[in-house]
């Protein structure tokens, strides 16, 4: 948890460095303060994660999930899991995960990455009422109650990772998701898009929005 007047900073060797945080508390994580990193940050809590109205997140990349990631997948790379016949999900639910576990971004919360970064959210229920911004990168909100699959695209015209879920959940966007010259992907059994999901296009780079 990060209180309203508190801050947490990860000082990492470079932008490719990754901090994996497995949160074992019996309740959702609550982030109301500032979270900063010059690299990648993973927040894993099977009970849910809340970004409150005063939350400000600035990282190179951010992954937030109620589904677990195994040590082998984390070490080998999330896009390599699909090539493994016995464990081909990048993220998978543990038996004790709350089937209604939620990732919520409240109105007023701001989540940003550096140029070319990525913000990914995986949970049975995902609700965004805040601002998510990843210039030249990718924003993925994929709702699933069991497994998420990620793969690199062979098509150079497609921006970002390809995403599939086994059993889809509910995604709601009432806020702003902006990926200038990048990609926005909203995926689930029910996708409620009543906010802004925008990916701009430049002369050399095509933006895209996938629902």
State each model region's role:
Residues 1-211:
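Extracellular and secretory-pathway beta-repeat/beta-biased strand scaffolds
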């Amino acid at each position: 948890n990060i209180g309203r007047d508190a801050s947490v900073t990860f000082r990492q060797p470079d932008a490719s460095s990754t901090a994996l945080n497995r949160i074992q508390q019996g309740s959702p994580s609550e982030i109301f303060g500032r979270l900063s990193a010059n690299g990648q940050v993973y927040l894993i809590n099977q009970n849910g994660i809340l970004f409150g109205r005063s939350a400000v997140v600035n990282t190179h990349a951010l992954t937030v999930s109620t589904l677990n990631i195994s040590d082998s997948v984390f070490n080998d790379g999330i896009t390599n899991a699909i090539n493994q016949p016995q464990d081909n999900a990048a993220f998978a639910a543990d038996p004790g995960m709350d089937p209604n576990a939620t990732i919520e971004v409240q109105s007023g919360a701001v989540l940003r990455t550096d140029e070319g970064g990525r913000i990914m959210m995986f949970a049975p229920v995902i609700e965004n009422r805040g601002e998510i911004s990843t210039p030249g990168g990718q924003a993925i909100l994929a709702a699933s109650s069991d497994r998420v699959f990620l793969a690199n695209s062979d098509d150079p015209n497609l921006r970002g990772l390809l995403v599939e879920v086994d059993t889809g959940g509910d995604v709601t966007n009432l806020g702003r998701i902006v990926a200038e010259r990048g990609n926005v992907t909203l995926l689930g059994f029910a996708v409620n898009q009543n906010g802004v999901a925008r990916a701009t296009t430049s002369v050399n780079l095509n933006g895209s929005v996938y629902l």
